[in-house]
Amino acid sequence: MFFERAVREEGASSVPAMRIAVIGAGPSGLATTIALMRRFRRPFEAWLIDAEDAPGAFGDGPAGRALTTEPARDLSVLPDRPDDFAEWLRGSLLAGSTVAALRGPQDMHVPRAVFRDYAMARFGEALSLRRDVRIRTFRGAVRHIGVEEAGLRVCFRDGESAKFDHVVIATGFGIAAREAASWRGAEAAAERLSQQADPPPLTLVGNGPRLAAILLDLRAGGFAGEIHVAAASGRLPQPHGRGHEGMAFGEPPATRSLKDAFRYIRNECSAAEARDGGQWQAVVDAASARLSVVWRNLPQAERNHYRRHLLRLHRHFSIRIARDVHRRLGAEFETGRTRFVPPCDPKTADENTIDCREMPSARALAGLLGRDAATLTVDDCGRLLSHGETLCGLSVVGAIASSLRPGPFTFAETVRQAYRAVLDIAPQGEARVLHR
């Protein structure tokens, strides 16, 4: 039921079509494919590859009922039109709505199914303008990505393989922790426990937006059993605050020390908070923006230190949920039916323990490439580097990139990174295609 457009036959182009693989069919993969169709100015054939889900499946079923973690103003797939999703809501869903008039669509958190419909609409529009493009979808689990003399080979677990000129890895959290598996496991466990006279508690492992959405959906569906939340930090997911627009910062130092970088960020953010009356959310967002700048000067050892000791905490305070969802989650804990318990490893737990964690795995990414995660990093354009050398033909976009660098933690950052990656593909791939 998805799109596939054949390359236009009449007046065949003299420019060979590039073969591009986009691994991951979630929001990051869709944003990347839209960016390709809007900004990549040569014929190409793109494969949207996913181990389990069709493009847009993140909006199906109970996951589609969950609210977006970010407000509409931050969910445009068009970086040159940051209010595009809010305007689409105003024109498509909220025309004449009292809610839209009172509140404005830009501040709304909507069901993910609605965001999916918007993204797919923009996908279709971009595709309709490109007669020199073919889009294919392929369901298969990627086992290995190998660099060959004239391209890259994507090998699947069923033994098949395909060769491409460029590969974009946009798996989100999905290499190690697939969202669909969390929803299915939670639903099955809740149904099983509801049929028992004296059931044990249902344990959800995690403390991010996925945990919040699944927990509240279980309660909305009538599950009345005890729920344990096994979270390393023992904290609820954090709510959104005001943006950090307007905060002014000094020139970042050209430091090669993570300690010096954080001292600069802490001092600048403290001054901005005192001067501008910023909330802690604004300070964290501003700190993330500054860390991305000083990150370029840090040696690999300092980057690895950040990933080992700071990334998990940084992510927890950077990825947030709607204020209403946060309020409902707090009220649920106050009932006593839901409580925090010490963290556990869901891989060694029983069938009533569901993994709801959202932590992209640098180790899983490195495993796909047959490399050591400690040698890898990602630059601002999504280029993947090993030992400081660019791995030609490979880009990493979205949440999976944040396993190797500070961000992107938001969808707007992911979209900007996707467009930078697409603009960077052309010079990388041109020589490879012409010398086939």
PLM region spans:
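A conserved beta-strand/loop capping segment in the N-terminal third of enzymes
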Residues: 81-108
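N-terminal glycine-rich dinucleotide-binding loop that anchors FAD/FMN and/or NAD(P) in oxidoreductases
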Residues: 62-87, 247-258, 325
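Generic low-complexity, intrinsically disordered sequence content enriched
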Residues: 7, 40, 71-72, 79-82, ...
